[in-house]
């Protein structure tokens, strides 16, 4: 045993009587050598490096070795210890910034997110990126891209087919409780635009929107008639004198 040990540690252990007391320097080879942080060339109980954690060669290697157990906390990321996959794409945020293969990261933190028209949208169980900006999408998108609970498509244009299929208040209704101008009735569904306030209002007395409205049109609010919140088809005046009321043809005064 002494002879074999002497041949390995001959540079540091010059005399046979020094074998059992081999200096620690024979184990602390320069960083970069194959035996760096390797099993001690002399007797293990004597020559195992005691400063493995602080050794620069341990921290740089991070490879399985005899001394890794002594410096795991320093040279092995915490994500590496429990994960069998590549942890790099998980460190930036709770969810990935771009579509990533699910096996790459642990599901607990790295559910794939939606990046544009990628197929990642269809398979994602996490709230995709196209839903993060607001409670409803800003423009019409394919429903499969986002969960229905938060991302019902909204109406971007009055002629958009998205209006007809939307169960959310479309864009043409969001500006105010009542529309600012005549709008095609199909654009705002009754389920989201209550007839008492959100039916089309007219921009002028001659507008056909007035005649088709199911609620008090705006052409009645300029006179002494009741405001547009009234559900009556008539322009009921609120003035004390009938002479001061302006009526459309076919309408009756209740003054």
Curated annotation (Swiss-Prot):
One Pfam assignment: Keratin_B2_2
Sequence repeat start-end pairs: 26-30, 36-40, 57-61, 79-83, 89-93, 99-103, 104-108, 109-113, 114-118, 120-124, 130-134, 145-149, 150-154, 162-166, 172-176, 182-186, 187-191, 192-196, 197-201, 209-213, 219-223, 224-228
GO cellular component terms, semicolon-separated: cytosol; keratin filament
InterPro entries referenced in this protein's UniProt entry, alphabetically: KAP
Tissues where the protein occurs: Restricted to a narrow region of the hair fiber cuticle, lying approximately 20 cell layers above the apex of the dermal papilla of the hair root; not detected in any other tissues.
Coiled coil regions, renumbered to chain: none
Keyword Repeat among UniProt keywords: yes
Transmembrane regions: none
Region named 22 X 5 AA repeats of C-C-X(3): 26-228
Keyword list, A-Z: Keratin, Repeat
SUBUNIT field: Interacts with hair keratins.
Stated role: In the hair cortex, hair keratin intermediate filaments are embedded in an interfilamentous matrix, consisting of hair keratin-associated proteins (KRTAP), which are essential for the formation of a rigid and resistant hair shaft through their extensive disulfide bond cross-linking with abundant cysteine residues of hair keratins. The matrix proteins include the high-sulfur and high-glycine-tyrosine keratins.
Family the entry assigns: Belongs to the KRTAP type 10 family.
Protein's recorded name: Keratin-associated protein 10-2
Organism: Homo sapiens
Lineage: Eukaryota, Metazoa, Chordata, Craniata, Vertebrata
């Amino acid at each position: 045993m002494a002879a074999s040990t002497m041949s390995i540690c001959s540079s540091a252990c010059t005399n046979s009587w020094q074998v059992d007391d081999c200096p620690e320097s024979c184990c602390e080879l320069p960083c970069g050598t194959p035996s760096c942080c390797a099993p001690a060339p002399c007797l293990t109980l004597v020559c195992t490096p005691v400063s493995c954690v602080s050794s620069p060669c341990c921290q740089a290697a991070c490879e399985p070795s005899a001394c890794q157990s002594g410096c795991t906390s320093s040279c092995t990321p915490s994500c590496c210890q429990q994960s069998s996959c590549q942890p790099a794409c998980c460190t930036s945020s709770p969810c990935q910034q771009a579509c990533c293969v699910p096996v790459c990261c642990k599901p607990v933190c790295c559910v794939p997110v939606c990046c544009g028209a990628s197929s990642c949208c269809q398979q994602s169980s996490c709230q995709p990126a196209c839903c993060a900006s607001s409670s409803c999408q800003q423009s019409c998108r394919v429903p499969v891209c986002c969960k229905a609970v938060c991302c019902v498509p909204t109406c971007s244009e009055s002629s958009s087919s998205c209006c007809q299929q939307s169960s959310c208040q479309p864009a043409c209704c969001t500006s105010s409780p009542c529309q600012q101008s005549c709008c095609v009735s199909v654009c705002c569904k009754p389920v989201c635009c209550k007839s008492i306030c959100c039916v089309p209002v007219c921009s002028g007395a001659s507008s056909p929107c007035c005649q088709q409205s199911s609620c008090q049109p705006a052409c009645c609010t300029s006179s002494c008639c009741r405001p547009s919140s009234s559900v009556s088809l008539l322009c009921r005046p609120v003035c004390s004198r009938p002479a001061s009321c302006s009526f459309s043809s076919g309408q009756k005064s209740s003054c």
